[in-house]
Amino acid sequence: VTAPAVALVERFTGRKVAATRSLSGGCVGKVLLVSLADGGRVVAKLGPGLEPEGWMLRYLARHSRLPLPHLVHGDDHILLMDYVEAGDSLTPAAEAHAAEVLALLHAHSWHSFGLDRDTVIGGLPQINTPNARWLDFFRDNRLLAMAEQARAAGRLPAVTMARIETLAGRLGNWLMEPAQPALLHGDAWTGNLLVRGDKVAAFIDPAIYYGHPEIELAFGTMFGTFNEPFFRRYEEISPLAPGFWEERRDLYLLYPLLVHTRLFGGSYLAGIDRIVDRFLG
């Protein structure tokens, strides 16, 4: 892998490569830290299947002030990004900073829920067919679409799929339409936040679309990424409507739980069953 990657890095940067080493990657591609002969460093992510990620990074750079790695070059086979000096833990101050920049991101709006193209999450197709109603978009393009991906892959039992379909028909009992569609990172958890000191230096691996900010906030609680310091600061900027913690958070967690079930199977099914049982009885 490395020799062709070196040639691509030298071609697209116009600089000589001195050394490479592997970094822990995501669900798509191999990731290399490339040291250049002039002392610079870039990160190379090797595909195929990388075009959507490059497109999303460019979209966020154009439409938001979210901290991002600068994209030097992007196509379906390679993404080249400036190396972001990071690696610190998410402190309370860094959580508060994450809340500030995500609240700013969520202030960017569009005429519909969805996007004018499909994107990916963890390498899986993420359907973004625009819809004027959030409840319909979440039901069809998030909950049912990802449940079907998991079922087709043999990771979601038919009985669970049937219960999710029943729940999908009743979402209006609990979910609310937001004031407007909000631009979402879509995959904001600890592994996709590069922290330096008391700030998030960059958000990586986006899965963007316009949706309800609450789905982003719910996912942020799934692995304990966002805690009291985050939510205190976020609500100073954009207060949450009553009922998020009591009801809506669990319903929105079904989407990332289904993504993880499709990718990894196993233990995530129990979380899905717990939530479905709670709302269907």
Which residue stretches match the model-derived regions?
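An alpha-helical support segment within catalytic cores of ATP-dependent transferases
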Residues: 2-10, 110-183, 236, 278
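Conserved N-terminal boundary motif of the eukaryotic protein kinase catalytic domain
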Residues: 13-21
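ATP-binding pocket architecture of kinase catalytic cores
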Residues: 21-136
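Hydrophobic packing residues in well-ordered alpha-helices of helical domains and bundles
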Residues: 95-98, 160, 164, 272
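Active-site Asp-x-Gly
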Residues: 134-139, 148, 180-183, 190-247, ...
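Hydrophobic alpha-helical segments that form the core
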Residues: 250-258
